[in-house]
A protein has these predicted regions:
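Canonical Radical SAM [4Fe-4S] cluster-binding loop centered on the CxxxCxxC motif
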Residues: 2-33, 343-357
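Glycine- and acidic
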Residues: 2-5, 16-26, 48-57, 115-122, ...
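Conserved SAM/AdoMet-binding glycine-rich loop
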Residues: 40-192, 196, 200
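Radical SAM enzyme core and accessory elements
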Residues: 229-384
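Extended low-complexity, intrinsically disordered regulatory tracts
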Residues: 369-407, 419-420
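Glycine/small-residue-rich interface belts in oligomeric ring/scaffold proteins
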Residues: 410-428
Length: 428
């Protein structure tokens, strides 16, 4: 129930577990003018009061300042909430925090992904604990008392020390809150750590790495839980059985088509909902089709084995993925595309050098004019008229719920009426 606005596509970072970061290369950004127009038109057309920014890292958008200035021209008065994706801690600045604090935002999210510097080098998450603490300090200084941290367990080359480091990092964030002079000490801090299970994905350097068995993943989750001793830390984790089924289909081949058909016949059609998911039923389906889940999810695939998805060319070369896999085993990080081209091959997708950071590529024009709100839009810095001076008219509406709509719930009805008012453009 929100507007989804794609800010840009692709990523310059190269996290070795992230499929979207590789298959969506090279980076392509929308201009701030296009984004602001699409956001306004979408809210006017749908009546939604929330805009969700869709991208891999909003703080990596090269024109974030101009974009947020354009949004501030109308979202504040329209009471439109801005939902932000996870931030890169190393590119999060006080200037960006000041801008997003001017609009109604949800809890800020950062994604360290691993609890130790060594494992972050393994997965190529090029951020340090100092950068994470600095980003959290900026958040707390702006009056926020909550942050979310995303992690993964079961990563390749992971140890118990890496898992315990997740709890230690969360505790350091709590300490950072109390060490920040500008923080609002009247409210208790809260750090939410959300830990997902590693799932090997095609077209990533970790596509050949195994997923840990469900019982091993469960042990890792329980171990992390035992390391958390502060009630100000909230721990969320994913279902290991669901993650294993996801891993089976992530690295599956055409033989899984028979399993999907059999699953539909067995009634497994709403398994995205936890109450309908039945892990044992899936095991029975695989057995009936003569398939071994461990073959797909839990084995290491040699470098010379042909993969089912090798017929798909996403632009990133197979040799590059294998090189990155070997660098991960030695905990060697690869710099971002902005710092140094790693010759991934994505630049071959377009004859005019689509990758802006590749040698000889078209870097484009980074100069973007400041966006001025259209006439009639409220500027974020402009003085707002006194509401008491506006003429007030009372309008009474009578309506009835008929037909199938007679069964609509009360909350859904209230939300529908609210969206109708927004779409009408009435100054309510």
């Amino acid at each position: 129930d929100r507007v989804t606005l794609e800010v840009f596509r692709g990523c310059i970072r190269g996290c070795r577990f992230c499929q979207a970061g590789f298959i969506c290369r090279p980076v392509r950004e929308k201009s701030p003018e296009v984004l602001c127009r699409q956001a306004k038109e979408s809210v006017d057309a749908t009546g939604y009061d929330e805009i969700s920014m869709c991208c891999l890292s909003i703080s990596d958008y090269s024109h974030i300042a101009s974009f947020t200035d354009g949004l501030l021209g109308w979202t504040d008065d329209a009471r439109v909430n801005i939902s932000l994706p996870s931030m890169r801690a190393d590119s999060f600045t006080r200037e960006l925090m000041d801008k997003i604090s001017s609009v109604r935002t949800s809890t800020l999210t950062f994604a360290p992904e691993a609890g130790s510097p060594r494992l972050r080098d393994v997965i190529n998450k090029n951020i340090t604990e100092e950068e994470i603490m600095r980003a959290c300090g900026i958040t707390f200084a702006a009056g926020k008392n909550q942050v979310k941290l995303y992690f993964m367990n079961g990563l390749p080359h992971e140890t118990d020390e890496d898992i315990a480091g997740i709890a230690e990092l969360a505790e350091h964030v709590i300490d950072k809150y109390y060490a920040t002079p500008e923080a609002n000490k009247k409210r208790r801090p809260q750090v939410t750590i959300s830990v997902a299970c590693f799932i090997p994905k095609p077209h990533t350097p970790f596509e050949r790495e195994p997923q840990a068995l469900p019982e091993v993943l469960l042990e890792k989750q329980q171990f992390l839980s035992s390391c958390i001793h502060d009630r100000k830390i909230r721990y969320n984790y994913h279902d290991v059985d669901v993650s294993r089924i996801e891993a089976v289909f992530a690295r599956g081949d055409r033989r899984l088509g028979a399993a999907i058909l059999e699953a539909v016949k067995c009634g497994a059609v709403f398994d995205a909902w936890t109450e309908f998911f039945d892990y044992n039923r899936w095991l029975e389906i695989f057995e009936k089709c003569g398939l071994d889940p461990a073959f797909y999810a839990n084995r290491t695939i040699p470098d010379d084995e042909i993969l089912p998805w090798d017929v798909i060319d996403c632009g990133v070369s197979k040799d590059f993925l294998i090189r990155e896999r070997h660098k991960a085993a030695e905990a060697i990080a690869t710099p971002s595309c902005k710092d140094k081209c790693s010759a991934c091959g994505a630049n071959s997708l377009a004859p005019n050098k689509a990758c802006r950071w590749c040698p000889g590529g078209d870097a484009g024009d980074d100069s973007v004019p400041h966006i001025v709100p259209e006439p009639g839009e409220m500027s974020a810095s402009a003085p707002k008229p006194d509401v008491s001076e506006r003429p007030i008219r009372t309008v009474r509406l009578r309506f009835a719920k008929k037909g199938a709509l007679a069964y609509i719930g009360h909350l859904d009805l209230v939300n529908a009426l609210s969206r109708v008012m927004i779409r009408s453009g009435l100054p309510v």
